[in-house]
Amino acid sequence: MEKEESTEQRKQARLAIMELANMISVPMALNAVVRLNVADAIWQGGANNPLSAAEILPRLLPAGGGDAENLQRLLRMLASYGVFYEHLSAGERKYSLTDVGKTLVTDEQGLSYAHYVLQHHQDALMRAWPMVHEAVVDPTKEPFERANGEPAYGYYLKHPEMNDLMVRAMSGVSVPFIRAMLEGYDGFQGVEKLVDVGGSGGDCLRMILEKHPTIKEGINFDLPEVVAKAPQIPFVTHVGGDMFKFIPQGDAIFMKWVLTTWTDEECKHIMQNCHKALPEGGKLIACEPVLPEDSDESHRTRALLEGDIFVMTIYRAKGKHRTEEQFRQLAIDAGFPRFRAFHVDHFYTVLEFQK
């Protein structure tokens, strides 16, 4: 019996390493169906009727041509990852969207997670991945910089099409999360002046002010070249500057996905500047990915750890996703005596640091 179990374990191990070695097929197949706009083609205004690859193809390529068999191969593989439902009848395979697949459907605002997928798989980012090991050998330069000659954010500014895609990607991810945050977190009660650090075009600040009309003034604070393109929003003032030098004063400061791309010392510096800008009792409200303590095999843990490696590879080799305890220590180091975490989403957590 022991020998049989050992043989089966070896078979399972070989199967597992084969899956890991071929796993690049998953994001590349996902990228392909996004580029082809498969989700919108199936969704068709909410119909989501099961369709064969041969039926989907003309919706993707109205002028004709294409290969339905190769499209089916992509759909079938992604069905095994829960992106599509596969309906098998009389030897014919048809596909509809799962809840995961529906996140790729363009909504009435032109948003979806599709841009997030595309942003992650641009050529400049893909060039960095074969160099991930260099982050272990020498963390002073990110794999992205090694592959492209300069850090990611500087590279984006020189390539407007990449920067525009990143902004659309962040909007597609931000809007559903902010909705969840506004439903599950009430920490904006009593705030009259709110500063959004790294607020980009001000979308999140606009949503917060619409939900909490008692906030009389919003400050959208970002780099000068970013806020220069920001649209006018009622009760919002766009302010350009550098968060490492100063942060505008407010009753509360909001930031999302800022701390994860900076080192511990840099985070401490940013948070100390927030501390200076807040009155006694004021709050820094940060939305960040928070790692679990245990490295289990759940979807949540894997998604968070994968995001951590993405940060290490593309943005900062020593920037990182952190555990709740690591954020608690940052709070102490930056002078915030009170810290609370609110789990309103499976990926992002609302962190409240009170002065």
Curated annotation (Swiss-Prot):
It is an enzyme of class 2 (transferase). GO terms for molecular function: nicotinate N-methyltransferase activity; O-methyltransferase activity; protein dimerization activity; S-adenosylmethionine-dependent methyltransferase activity. It catalyses: nicotinate + S-adenosyl-L-methionine = N-methylnicotinate + S-adenosyl-L-homocysteine. The keyword Methyltransferase applies. It comes from the Eukaryota. One of its GO terms (biological process) is biosynthetic process. Coiled coil: none annotated. It holds the Pfam family Dimerisation. Keywords: Methyltransferase, S-adenosyl-L-methionine, Transferase. Its EC number is 2.1.1.7. S-adenosyl-L-methionine binds at residue 222. The keyword Transmembrane does not apply. Involved in nicotinate detoxification in planta. Catalyzes the conversion of nicotinate to N-methylnicotinate, which is a detoxified form of endogenous nicotinate in planta. Belongs to the class I-like SAM-binding methyltransferase superfamily. Cation-independent O-methyltransferase family. This is Nicotinate N-methyltransferase 1. The lineage of its organism: Eukaryota, Viridiplantae, Streptophyta, Embryophyta, Tracheophyta. The gene is NANMT1.
